[in-house]
Design a protein with these regions (language model features):
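Metabolite-binding pocket within alpha/beta catalytic cores that recognizes anionic/polar moieties
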Residues: 1-154, 187, 202, 273
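Short flexible/disordered coil segments
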Residues: 114-120, 155, 219-235, 271-282
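Divalent-metal-activated hydrolytic enzyme cores
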Residues: 256-284
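Active-site rim beta-loop-alpha module in soluble metabolic enzymes
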Residues: 120-124, 128-188, 193-207, 213-218
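Active-site phosphate/oxyanion-binding loops
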Residues: 98, 105, 163-179, 207-253
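Residues that form generic nucleotide/phosphate-binding pockets
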Residues: 19, 151, 183, 227, ...
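Active-site oxyanion-binding pockets that recognize sulfate/phosphate
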Residues: 134, 251-258
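Conserved active-site and cofactor/substrate-binding residues in soluble primary-metabolism enzymes
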Residues: 8-11, 59-66, 75, 139, ...
Length: 284
């Protein structure tokens, strides 16, 4: 069975790559991973035993859908794990905790459109017009959810099975995160996981989304977070460094949270690899 890992940015799977003793600038590395050709705006890797493929899509719907189309056509995985960072929408989650998505919600539009009343289409017979704002949802693959849940329980990894939400823009402030959690009954919010699951569902490929919490429900991300490029890699070091010089404490807390979330994802992958849950490491 072949497994595909999908994330939006290199930071989310950097530890997974580095634990394989592989670097993209080492042309003839004998490590676990090798780089593949990928669609413009994405980065793709593959384990040398061909058991696991990985694609970094970039953030947002358009990039995710384009990269997923390539992945499903080129790699044809048997199962997909959507991995990455997320903001908490409930006080029951701490930085570094994992959220196993039981149901994936998506809301179109901007934060001004997210009130549930605005998501109900106007009655066309009464002369109104259909609203563009929609609320959609996808159920997680039950078998994959059970497999991963069992693995994290046995290994003592902090996690929560819960619905998650995908929106079009970064949710940066604590007040909005808390409101989304209370309004829609979700525990985490991101920008990509719904689109990964939707593409996998159309192709008939089992998919599970696992998100690592990078900031709590009572925390507000630094303003710089909303100005970083959506590319899978590159273009973020300079702005982050400049912001860190001006606001060292805020940036130190943010980078520490990113490191905790990144390590949580890597720990999950180590557990899944060592337990051979998805036959990772075996030749097809």
């Amino acid at each position: 069975m072949s497994l595909a890992l999908v994330a939006s940015r290199r930071e989310e799977l950097a530890t997974v790559l580095s634990r394989g003793a592989w670097r993209p600038w080492r042309q003839r590395s004998e490590g676990v991973w090798r780089q593949r050709r990928a669609p413009e705006g994405a980065l793709a890797y593959q384990r040398r035993d061909h058991s696991v493929s990985m694609i970094l899509t970039g953030a947002g719907r358009a990039q995710t859908e384009k990269a997923m189309a390539w992945l499903l056509e080129t790699e044809r995985p048997d199962s997909i794990l959507s991995l990455g960072f997320s903001g908490a929408c409930t006080p029951n989650l701490d930085i570094g905790d994992l959220v196993l998505a039981t149901r994936l919600h998506h809301i179109e539009g901007s934060p001004f459109d997210w009130d549930p009343e605005s998501l109900n289409p106007t009655d066309l017979q009464s002369g109104g017009s259909q609203l563009d704002v929609t609320h959609e949802e996808i159920l997680a693959d039950a078998k994959m959810l059970d497999i991963v849940r069992g693995a994290v329980e046995i290994n003592g990894i902090d996690f929560m099975p819960s619905p998650t939400l995908t929106v079009n823009s970064l949710v940066r402030t604590s007040g909005l995160s808390e409101w989304l959690g209370e309004t829609y009954g979700i525990s985490a919010v991101d920008r990509e996981s719904y689109w990964v699951a939707a593409a996998a569902g159309r192709a008939g490929v089992p998919c599970l989304s696992v998100r690592a919490i990078v900031y709590g429900v009572d925390e507000t991300l630094p303003e710089i977070a909303s100005r970083l490029p959506d590319t899978p890699s590159g273009g973020r070091l300079g702005p982050i460094f400049k912001y860190g010089v001006r606001h060292p404490r805020k940036m130190w807390r943010y980078m520490r949270a990113v490191r905790s979330a990144r390590n949580a994802v890597a720990t999950l992958m180590t557990v899944l690899t060592n337990s051979d849950i998805f036959n990772v490491g075996k030749n097809p």
